[in-house]
Amino acid sequence: MSWTSDKRFVFFIFFSLGSLYPCLSNAIDRTQIAVIVNTRDRLSVEIGQYYAKQRRIPFQNFIEVHFSPSGSTLTIKEFGAIKASVDEQTMPGVQAYALTWAAPYRVDCMSITSAFAFGFDPAFCAVGCKPTRRSPYYNSRARLPFTQLGIRPTMAIAATSFEQAKALIDRGVDSDGSIPTGTAYLLSTSDNTRNVRSASYPLVERILNGRLHVRRQNANSLANANDVLFYFIGKAHVEGLETLHFVPGAIADHLTSTGGMLTDDSGQMSALRWLEAGATGSYGTVIEPCNLVQKFPNPVVAIGRYLLGETLIETYWKSVQMPGQGIFIGEPLAAPYLRPYQR
């Protein structure tokens, strides 16, 4: 099923947004997310401690694991031991996880965020240009993903320095309930292979007209914009990021093969560059996915659900139909459109 043929979700977003920002049942909150730190990685510990303090995470939701942080990929066996330890320490009410490192970002053929969410499962992998198992959380109205669906969506607070991590966390906290008036930039590029999401852009404009400023543009990059709230593009490298100002809570990603290889030189831009430029959330695949749109964020879902008051981790996870090969990075609890009474 193509994105634009998902009539059920289109009607849900259209009518929900008719009241602008309706009061949904509570989004995932600080009591329902567990922070996972690697005690053998000093930066991970620093990030985890700062995040727990800023978000007032309950002490029982602070989970410690112990493994060498030297590599980009965990073996299935290594991950199995880590996951068993995490499961043992996870409180029953926890609905989501926040990782506190940029590497490792992969478990064999899965991204590390999907491996923590689903458990390692080769059905979420693919050899060649093939689809993978779909996520039951895609387009879901579930408010308690573990209780209702048996999965804990996971996002990495990814950074290569504490200063970068601190700035990211602060942006997420600052975004809460800010109801920003930024712009959604939807770029159609000359890279036909990576421009496959552009078919959904007219639908974004049609649904969100009058509720958010949407700017569709035929260009290979965006420059000198000071109100970036969403930025979706298909390119291996994205130029001009240093000229942009991202609104706190901003989501930005580029559809390409290896944007999720966060700390390695893959010949393509790492999704970390978005966070370093000021975005609060991004996404990239850790292994060749081919250009199946279902393996990348759907702009209609991502923008629509964010405007409905969902957190970044809920919004982004619900926007990817086949997330097995993709890593979600950012500040999980950022919620620019969540009214205070919705917490």
Predicted region positions:
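Cysteine-dependent hydrolase recognition
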Residues: 27-343
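Sec-dependent N-terminal signal peptides
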Residues: 9-18
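N-terminal signal peptide c-region/cleavage motif recognized by signal peptidases
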Residues: 20-22
